[in-house]
């Protein structure tokens, strides 16, 4: 007779925790309503929600959710991509780094192997850029990377092969100019994201501007494309609605540097060691108040001619990037600094900047080149 203590007792089955009644009822709603509800929540809650059930996990990584956030205006600028080029024994190597809320105030190598392109632009969660041909030759192909779904795509080729073109975005349309032969009828063209078609636009009146690399940067202010060219050329403005070119004001060009960006239809630039904004009504540059504090961190460089300063629209805030040698005197490395500035206009019309934080975000060899910053919303 087997002793009672040796008899195996049947093990009780462990019950999986059931979903709360409220959650079960919530999941009975159509996906369209679920997506609309999730789109109104902060992305900071998405990680916890993804643990609730498979349905949430699937919806939280879907394109319809991003589209709903975009339409509701609840997308968040949460990542700054920087492309840097480093000298190696064989050939220069371009690498992307990211500065996000998750990484804090430190640049980390990007998880995405994005190609470098001077014409890289963002539209929502998608990054668009031109494919570089063999040996960095001209190309008409365009790649897309969706940071929300982490997927790649393509669009129809441009009508003109380009190299180091300039691009900007206005009303779901991508405008590309330059980087090609000045004799081409498609020197300036527009891509409509909705119709997936390219259309040629009127070329710049100045043939010299249309030669390679004479367009430094373009961006949009009040429905017009502002074109910054080389120092020896005239700057231009293209009125999108009228399809007309006009020369930029001489005083505007006088202090308009290559370090500039547009935030809420206001142009900001860094020139003559000051941060400025352009008053369209008064047709003059004004200084952004409250940023003299930054001079102590940026003016100590002993190589001002080669010092980098970049301005980026980071979700309505001004992200300022600059470099300086790691130590005074001889140094083989440079520190890349970043300052995040909140902007406010006072009753007298002056714009004030408040530095929310600043820090060294990366240390790099002094031989590096800063190529491109872009901000992405997800």
Curated annotation (Swiss-Prot):
Q: Which SUPFAM superfamilies match?
A: F-box domain, Kelch motif
- Provide the leader sequence positions: none
Q: Where is the F-box domain?
A: 23-69
Pfam families (UniProt xref)? F-box, Kelch_FKB95
Q: Where are the Kelch repeats?
A: 124-172, 173-218, 220-259, 260-305
- The answer to whether the entry has keyword Repeat is yes
Q: List the disulfide bonds.
A: none
UniProt entry keywords in alphabetical sequence: Kelch repeat, Repeat
Do the record's keywords include Repeat?
A: yes
Q: Which InterPro entries match?
A: F-box-like_dom_sf, F-box/kelch-repeat_ARATH, F-box_dom, Kelch-typ_b-propeller, Kelch_1
Checking Gene3D superfamilies in the record gives: 1.20.1280.50, Kelch-type beta propeller (2.120.10.80)
- Look up and give the organism this protein is from: Arabidopsis thaliana
Q: What is this protein called?
A: F-box/kelch-repeat protein At4g29370
Task: Show the PROSITE patterns listed in the entry.
Answer: FBOX
């Amino acid at each position: 007779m087997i002793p009672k203590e040796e008899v195996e007792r049947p093990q009780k089955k462990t019950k999986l925790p059931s979903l709360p009644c409220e959650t079960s009822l919530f999941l009975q709603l159509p996906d369209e309503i679920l997506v609309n509800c999730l789109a109104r929540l902060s992305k900071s809650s998405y990680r916890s929600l993804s643990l609730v059930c498979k349905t949430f996990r699937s919806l939280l990584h879907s394109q319809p959710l991003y589209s709903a956030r975009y339409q509701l205006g609840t997308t968040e600028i949460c990542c700054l991509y920087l492309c840097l080029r480093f000298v190696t024994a064989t050939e220069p190597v371009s690498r992307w780094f990211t500065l996000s809320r998750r990484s804090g105030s430190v640049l980390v190598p990007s998880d995405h192997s994005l190609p470098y392109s001077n014409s890289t632009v963002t539209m929502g969660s998608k990054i668009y850029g031109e494919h570089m041909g063999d040996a960095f030759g001209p190309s008409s192909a365009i790649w897309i990377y969706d940071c929300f779904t982490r997927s790649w795509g393509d669009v129809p080729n441009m009508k003109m092969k380009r190299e180091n073109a300039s691009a900007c975005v206005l009303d779901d349309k991508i405008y590309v100019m330059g980087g090609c032969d000045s004799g081409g009828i498609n020197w300036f063209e527009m891509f409509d994201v909705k119709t997936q078609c390219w259309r040629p636009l009127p070329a710049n009146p100045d043939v010299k501007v249309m030669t390679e690399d004479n367009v430094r940067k373009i961006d949009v202010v009040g429905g017009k494309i502002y074109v910054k060219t080389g120092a020896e050329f005239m700057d231009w403005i293209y009125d999108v609605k009228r399809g007309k070119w006009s020369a930029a004001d001489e005083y505007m060009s006088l202090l308009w540097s290559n370090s500039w960006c547009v935030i809420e239809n206001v142009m900001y630039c860094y020139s003559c060691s000051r941060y400025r904004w352009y008053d369209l009504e008064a047709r003059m540059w004004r200084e952004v108040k409250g940023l003299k504090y930054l001079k102590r961190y940026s003016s100590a460089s002993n190589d001002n001619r080669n010092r980098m300063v970049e301005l980026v629209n980071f979700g309505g805030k001004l992200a300022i990037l600059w470099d300086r040698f790691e130590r005074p005197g001889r140094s083989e490395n440079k520190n890349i600094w970043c300052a995040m500035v909140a902007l406010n206009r006072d009753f007298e019309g002056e714009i004030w900047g408040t530095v929310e934080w600043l820090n060294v975000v990366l240390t790099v060899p002094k031989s590096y080149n800063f190529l491109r910053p872009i901000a992405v919303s997800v």
